[in-house]
Amino acid sequence: MTDLHQTYYRQVKNPNPVFTPREGAGTLKFCEKLMEKAVGFTSRFDFAIHVAHARSKGLRRRMPPVLRRRAIDALLQ
């Protein structure tokens, strides 16, 4: 028998998070520019450098898992 916990295990509740703004809420131009720059931040070299720096200081042991990085990207939007 297969263990059900291994078959359906996920690291996050929503594996494909998406930012959805409120209806009727406007966004400032400055915020829109920041959101455009933040798209895909966790998959770029900059984020890898931040993680490497945190590892050198002893704050992290490894790069966050892919699903957690997707959640971070959604939060930056």
UniProtKB/Swiss-Prot annotation:
Coiled coil: none
Keywords (A to Z) from UniProt: DNA replication, Plasmid, Plasmid copy control
This protein's record includes keyword DNA-binding: no
Keyword DNA damage tagged: no
Entry's Gene Ontology BP terms: DNA replication; plasmid maintenance
Function statement: This protein is essential for plasmid replication; it is involved in copy control functions.
Anything else known: This replication protein is compatible with the repA replicon for the IncFII R plasmids.
Protein name per UniProt: Replication initiation protein
Taxonomic source organism: Escherichia coli
